A protein has these predicted regions:
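Tryptophan-rich substrate-binding surfaces of secreted polymer-degrading and adhesive proteins
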Residues: 1-216, 286-290, 337-339, 382-384
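Conserved, function-critical positions that sit in or immediately flank catalytic
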Residues: 167, 171-397
């Protein structure tokens, strides 16, 4: 039987990593200073930086030598770690997918042509760094590939999303990225999601989060998708059956075909549902209530947006001599609970570290980053090292 790692397991892994930051000592480190040809450094060949097939090496040999190749590192704190999702910018005259709970190999996202919610373009970030999820995009099963274009930038920040716009879109506000997070984490490929969403006391987060889990919003249905309009129907109202209660819709028809279904009461407590058409004389209609994530939109944005990736911010500058700026690097990594140099079993907890040895030079010689230096140890033993940095003023190698 085949198996695969689910999206929810990946999200759990990202959550677990972030939650472990405060209980452990994690460090972002740089390594593998750029050598000069023809003296490639440890673990490299002379063309390591030019090969078109330059895939990273991941084996126990390299794992054992990270201490030899690392240059310096900086401690990772919870303030410098965020969950991220792929960046989908709102652009006028662009088509977007709507949120659906049932995208799969049997149900394709009509705009992005994918079969997974988290791979589809069902949310956007605006130029004001506000994030919205798309609840409706004007599509139906009658013509699922004809996705209207979004013409009006979402701006409403109410808990209850506004009615459908004339372009067919309906957007639900989730959050706004803070200016401090923009400075640290802004990216062309991803945008960050606020930390500690489930326990935050931030007024804006509390408003959206609690709105997704109130008596009114709890698993409330916001949208019913018309997969098939059928025939022989008349304008009417109908209830939404399932494991929730209180859901009702208003149905509009054209020549006997259902052409509009408006949720007049979303009810609460639904994890599945069907529109009750048993009292109707029509046939062939298929109406799909769209089930919200978790307890409602905005309650758990990590599941709602699929935050299975983590972005780490680490700034290395010349404010400390531990971070020389005249070097280069080809390795970026994360260390967990490194031990101090002098004590076995003692975890290093400082703010930054240097893995480099230093030598004072008393003679005038030409030294370049990447040069190989040797020392005869006697008995045929020769120690080798590579220059990571050289301070021409202090003569410290």
């Amino acid at each position: 039987m085949s198996a695969f790692v689910t999206d929810q397991f990946r999200i759990l892994n990202a959550n677990s990593f972030i939650e472990s930051i405060n209980d452990n000592s994690y460090y972002a480190f740089l390594g593998l200073s750029n050598p000069t040809t023809p003296n490639p450094g440890f673990g490299r060949t002379s063309d390591w930086n030019t090969s078109i097939n330059n895939n990273p090496i991941d084996n126990f040999q390299y794992l054992s030598h990270y201490r030899d190749t690392s240059l310096f590192g900086k401690k990772i704190t919870s303030e410098n770690v965020r969950r991220v999702v792929k960046r989908v910018d709102w652009i006028s005259n662009t088509s977007y997918d709507m949120y659906r709970h049932d995208y799969s190999e049997y149900t394709e996202a009509p705009s992005s042509k994918v079969f997974n919610l988290y791979n589809s373009n069902y949310y956007v970030i605006t130029d004001e760094f506000k994030v919205y999820i798309c609840l409706e995009n004007g599509t139906s099963g009658k013509n699922p590939t004809n996705v209207p274009r979004s013409l009006f930038k979402p701006v409403d920040t109410s808990i209850e999303p506004p009615t459908v716009g004339s372009d067919g879109y309906r957007w639900k506000y989730l959050f706004t990225i803070s200016p401090s997070d923009i400075i640290k984490f802004d990216s062309t490929e991803y945008f960050i999601v606020p930390n500690n969403w489930e326990n935050s006391l931030n007024n804006e987060i509390v408003r959206i989060r609690d709105g997704g889990n109130s008596d009114i919003q709890n698993n409330q249905i916001k949208k019913v998708y018309i997969e098939s309009g059928g025939s022989g129907y008349v304008d009417t109202t109908a209830s939404i059956l399932g494991d929730g209660s209180g859901g009702e819709v208003s149905i509009t028809t054209t020549n006997g075909e259902i052409t509009s279904v408006v949720v007049t009461s979303g009810g609460k407590g639904y994890t599945y549902g069907i529109v009750n058409l048993n009292s109707s004389s029509g046939t062939g209609a298929k109406l799909i209530p769209i089930i919200p994530p978790s307890k409602g939109h905005g309650y758990d944005i990590y599941k709602e947006l699929g935050t299975d990736k983590v972005l780490i911010y680490a700034r290395f500058d010349d404010s400390t001599k531990d971070f020389p700026t005249d070097t280069k690097f080809a390795q970026v990594g994360i260390l967990k609970n490194p031990e101090t140099f002098s004590g076995v079993g003692i975890t290093f907890t400082g703010g930054n570290f240097s893995s480099l040895y230093s030598i004072g030079i008393t003679t005038s010689i030409s030294i370049n980053v990447g040069d190989k230096i040797t020392q005869n140890q006697g008995n045929g033993l020769i120690a080798e090292g590579y220059v990571a940095s050289f301070d021409t003023e202090t003569k410290i190698l």
